Swiss-Prot record:
Gene3D superfamilies: 1.10.1420.10, P-loop containing nucleotide triphosphate hydrolases (3.40.50.300). GO terms for cellular component: nucleoplasm; synaptonemal complex. Coiled coil: none annotated. Involved in DNA mismatch repair and meiotic recombination processes. Facilitates crossovers between homologs during meiosis. It comes from Mus musculus (Mouse). InterPro entries: DNA_mismatch_repair_Msh2, DNA_mismatch_repair_MutS_C, DNA_mismatch_repair_MutS_core, DNA_mismatch_repair_MutS_sf, MutS, P-loop_NTPase. One of its GO terms (biological process) is female gamete generation. Residues 1-45 are annotated as: Disordered. The keyword Transport does not apply. SUPFAM superfamilies: DNA repair protein MutS, domain III, P-loop containing nucleoside triphosphate hydrolases. Belongs to the DNA mismatch repair MutS family. This is MutS protein homolog 5. ATP binds at residues 591-598.
Length: 833
């Protein structure tokens, strides 16, 4: 049986009550040694892995439970083709005992599961397929199931809100398929009671943690990183009616590298971007092709291949229509052009060096079956006539019977004119004219114009004719001659159409029998299209080939550039990076605002990413070591639906890095801690960095850009070779601050916030007051409140008092200074002091 239903609940058996920790039971005495003096060790139960998977709209959600460590592992939503190659790699790597999924699945997933189910009776045995109702995988019910779970790693003292915040830092709730897979897995575990089959029913399946799962050959990058590095960026399309989603690719890395000529090339490039890899053989094979097309003597070949690739169309959709017998005339045209373009690609690649694997694959796998398909279509299909009649028609000399019927059909109008003249001779003299017409499916009819006296239905009756119907003031009849024509000629149009449809079906069978070749053509052609696009971008932007070295841990870049910023700026200052050893694993970068710190962080991340997808990079030289993940905390991706503050989102991003980063990970942090009190933010930043530094050689490669100069001044980080302090070089020219955008050793002396405020257009009095308060804080002096209006009134009162003094005539004998002071000066004192 291909699929099994989920078994019923296991009856509760004897066992400890829930809530009593295992440590509360007395430890059993060790067993006595046997006669041989050797103690028998308890055999460890074999680990079981139970996988839950969902596939929808080209994306895959995966979660599995490992009984060896009682941990649930999940993989964020990942794109996967209908062939489900990614799912197959997951199955090969984790080798699950069971695969849990929804009973309501797509056709591609159903075929894949059917194939898996057929392996259950083979050796080695395949996984058990378990189908659960689709309601168990609902998004909301799955989310509530996750949030309401009883987990031993969450303290009972946590409130419901704190629990939600904690779980949101571990589980990507924005990945809908992953959340649904996790919810379905929890439902399956509670039904099967994995590991607690013999315990009381109130004892739940132990879950000791949630961990992110990444295939060994892939590099882990979350959606926040894709967004802040501008690897992908969607924006509104100006002509919304032209595109289904209303979105187009904005200024992004994908946007500037996507020069693919066929749709499937664009899909493959996006797939490569979502799956950066560590397989050196695969990466070098991509770079070999790019390097070949960058040679000046191969430019013409690259342009010719690009032209051929523009004719490679959506073959799978055409094959699907053929299977459903819904083929259009345009499908035959598209398939014909695609196959002939594929033959052109094959002939071109056979003249290229066969030492490059892609050229060898195209030369060998684009077999003569393609020529057979193209020859069949070209010899059978009459494209000009098919477009005119909007249906499938065949060329002459394919079927003699069809040709004969078409000749008769062509000569039919003149023949019918002669028949109509004979019919008119036998009609009433009041009928001025008639015609014999042919209507498919009905046959030959005599058409007579309606006369004025023909009002009632009884007036339509004519002796010797059978009335059929009235249409557009013309009466249609069957006569003896039209009946004879039906017998002699038959329904020519329908017969021709039926015979041509039969030929089309036979041609479809010939094409479908070679569908695997066409699918392989699409795979290799799209791969060639992507590499030609990357080569074109590398040529135009001056990229160089990266080198991969498993010996170094990190990256080394000489004169690297930001691939997007250099296109927007008139001049761009390159900077180098060296984090390829055990020294300087944590780089603290200080400098004024707008000095280029954030651009440098993104530059390091983008160059590393480009190397991991097999692209040339914007640098003079780049050496990439072992990188397993890229984490970022650069920009807060806010959303009302998340229900989290900006600072909480920042903390979640840092928590992902702290919980998952290894010694092979790249972590980019920009201005962490600015979303809360400066003291608390500084303390959190220092605590995170000290946590990583305490790992020693296992510390990830961390780049931190910060304006917290106290981090250095207060020596909050331990001194040692793991920490390296860098700054963006600047120069003060009078009151102006000149940015050199050059990274150098050292620490910034000041933040120069007043200069940045002036650039932003703040009024000068505000900037002056800010500098005054800053100086008072540094010197430890009290800050007095100030009011510009009060100060202006004081000046006016002082001026008025001075004017009174100037008007005094000190030589006047009647002047009494005591009266002047008591009446004029002393009352004004409170207004001027």
């Amino acid at each position: 049986m291909a699929f099994r239903a989920t078994p019923g609940r296991t009856p509760p058996g004897p066992g400890p009550r829930s809530g009593i920790p295992s440590a509360s039971f007395p430890s059993p005495q060790p067993p006595m040694a046997g006669p041989g003096g050797i103690e028998e060790e308890d055999e460890e139960e074999p680990a079981e892995i139970h996988l839950c998977v969902l596939w929808s709209s080209g994306y895959l959600g995966i979660a599995y439970y490992d009984t060896s460590d009682s941990t649930i592992h999940f993989m964020p939503d990942a794109p996967d083709h209908e062939s489900l190659k990614l799912l197959q790699r997951v199955l090969d790597e984790i080798n699950p005992q069971s695969v849990v999924t929804s009973a309501k699945q797509d056709e591609a997933m159903t075929r894949f599961l059917g194939k898996l189910a057929s392996e259950e009776h083979r050796e080695p045995k395949g996984p058990e397929i378990i189908l659960l109702p689709s309601v168990d995988f609902g998004p909301e019910i799955s989310k509530q199931r996750l949030l309401s779970g009883n987990y031993s790693f969450i303290s009972d003292s946590m409130t419901a809100t704190e629990k939600i915040l904690f779980l949101s830092s571990i589980i990507p709730f924005d990945c809908v398929l992953t959340v649904r897979a996790l919810g379905g897995l929890l439902k399956f575990l509670s039904r099967r009671r994995i590991g607690v089959e013999l315990e009381d029913y109130d004892v739940g399946v132990p879950i000791l943690g949630f961990k992110k799962f990444v295939l060994t050959h892939l590099v882990s990058i979350d959606q926040d990183t894709y967004s802040v590095l501008q690897i992908f960026k969607s924006e509104s399309h100006p002509s919304v009616y032209k595109v289904a989603s209303g979105l187009k690719e904005g200024l992004s890395l994908f946007g500037i590298l996507n020069r693919c000529r066929c749709k499937w090339g664009q899909k493959l490039l996006r797939l490569w971007f979502t799956r950066p890899t560590r397989e050196l053989r695969e990466l070098n094979s991509r770079l070999d092709v790019i390097q070949f097309f960058l040679m000046p003597q191969n430019l013409d070949m690259a342009q010719m291949l690009h032209r051929l690739l523009s004719h490679i169309k959506n073959v799978p959709l055409i094959l699907k229509r053929m299977k459903l017998s819904h083929t259009k005339v345009s499908d035959w045209q598209v398939l014909y052009k695609t196959v002939y373009s594929a033959l052109g690609l094959r002939d071109a690649c056979r003249s290229l060096p066969q030492s490059i694997q892609l050229f060898q694959d195209i030369a060998q796998e684009f077999s003569d079956d393609l020529h057979h398909i193209a020859s069949l279509i070209g010899k059978v299909v009459d494209f000009e006539e098919s477009l005119a009649e909007n249906r499938f028609t065949v060329l002459p000399n394919i079927d003699p019977d069809i040709d004969a019927k078409k000749r008769r059909l062509i000569g039919l109008p003149s023949f019918l004119t002669e028949v109509a003249q004979k019919e008119l001779e036998n009609l009433d003299s009041r009928i001025p004219s008639c015609s014999v017409i042919y209507i498919p499916l009905i046959g030959f009819l005599l058409s007579i114009p309606r006369l004025p006296f023909m009002v009632e239905a009884s007036d339509f009756e004519i002796e010797g004719l059978d009335f059929m119907f009235l249409s557009e003031d013309k009466l249609h009849y069957r006569s003896a001659r039209t009946k004879e024509l039906d017998t002699l000629l038959g329904d020519l149009h329908c017969e021709i159409r039926d015979q041509e449809t039969l030929l089309m079906y036979q041609l479809q069978c010939q094409v479908l029998a070679r569908a695997s070749v066409l699918t392989r053509v699409l795979d290799l052609a799209s791969r060639l299209d992507v590499l030609l696009a990357l080569a074109s971008a590398a040529r135009d932007y001056g990229y160089s080939r990266p080198h991969y070295s498993p010996c170094i841990h990190g990256v080394r870049i000489r004169n690297g550039r930001h691939p997007l910023m250099e296109l927007c700026a008139r001049t761009f200052v390159p900077n180098s990076t060296d984090c390829g050893g055990d020294q300087g694993r944590v780089k603290v970068i200080t400098g004024p605002n707008s000095s280029g710190k954030s651009i440098y962080l993104k530059q390091v991340g983008l160059i590393t990413f480009m190397a991991l997808v097999g692209s040339f990079v914007p640098a003079e030289e780049a050496e990439i070591g072992v990188i397993d993940a890229i984490f970022t905390r650069i920009h807060s991706c806010e959303s009302i639906s998340l229900g989290l503050s900006t600072f909480m989102i920042d903390l979640n991003q840092v928590a992902k890095a702290v919980n998952n980063a290894t010694e092979h990970s790249l972590v980019l942090i920009d201005e962490f801690g600015k979303g809360t009190n400066s003291v608390d933010g500084l303390a959190l930043l220092a605590a995170v960095l000290r946590h990583w530094l305490a790992l020693g050689p296992s510390c990830p490669h961390v780049f931190v850009a910060t304006n917290f100069l106290s981090l250095v001044q207060l020596q909050l980080l331990p001194q040692g070779p793991l920490v390296q302090y860098l700054t963006m070089e600047t120069c003060e020219d009078g009151e102006d601050l000149v940015f050199f955008y050059q990274l150098c050793q050292g620490v910034a002396s000041a933040s120069h916030a007043s200069h940045t405020a002036a650039q932003a257009g703040l009024p000068d009095p505000l900037i002056a007051r800010g500098k005054e308060v800053s100086d008072l804080i540094r010197s430890g002096k009290p800050i007095k409140a100030t009011n510009e209006l009060l100060r202006r009134n004081q000046m006016e009162n002082c001026q008025a008092l001075v004017d009174k003094f100037l008007k005094l005539d000190l030589e006047d004998p009647t002047l009494d200074l005591d009266i002047f002071i008591s009446q004029e000066v002393l009352p004004a004192a409170p207004t001027i002091l």
